[in-house]
Amino acid sequence: MKKIWGILLVLLLLCMTGCGSSPKSAQQATPQKIELSVFAALGLKDVLIDIQKEYEAKHPDVKIIYNFAATGVLQKQIGQGAPADVFVTAAAKNMDDMVEQKLVIANTRRDIVSNDLVLIVNKESGLDLHSFADLANDEVKRVGIGAPETVPAGQYAIDVMKFLGIWDRVKEKAVQTKDVITVRSYVETGNVEAGVVFYTVAVTSNKLKVVATAPKGSHPPIVFPGAVVANSKQSQAAETFLDYLVSPEGMRVFQKYGFSPLK
């Protein structure tokens, strides 16, 4: 009988110890991280992944989840109700449209950085190209540009060629792609002889050379704006992230990748 009482006493003590430690364990439980969904233009992929490392180190309660694609594709996804918190585009016009459609919160808009539009060829190319106007030459057979309906760099490219009066001669040579990264890839592999991309996309490849920069005034200013998506459930955290992008810390990373601060 004493043996039975001893066993029961031990079990009771164990139960009391377990119950007593439960609140403490609950208090020590790791708080759930805020998941921030950022829809961003594909040309920003490298720099934003770098920024993510720094941002999450400074904000351990936040986990950033990126969706990279052509600006127009992302715009359509958000318009169809895709869950997103932040939208960063490669053109002011796209953001203007989003504001007008009330798909983003207008007063959270931040104009982040600028970029240049450049003409690229393969380093092994024998083409004698020195300017965008040279794309009209007969020796150039195929020119890669982003599809203007969804890729801002593609629309900028057409703007430049119309400005120079050569679009009618170049449009038959134009190979339209789903994004600027594909344009770069096509030039690297020889699928096209030349391509038009953002400067920051060109300089990440060691197989290409920049032969010309679009003349000033030949296209609208290239600005990369960001804003909080209207249906975001993390609007405060989203705006804090946008503030970081335009902060000195964020701008330092952007400049490392070739982007220019806005003047």
Kindly give the residue locations of the regions a language model identified:
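Conserved beta-strand core positions
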Residues: L36, V62-I64, L117
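Periplasmic-binding protein-like
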Residues: D85-T89
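Sec-dependent N-terminal signal peptides of Gram-positive bacterial secreted proteins and lipoproteins
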Residues: M1-K24
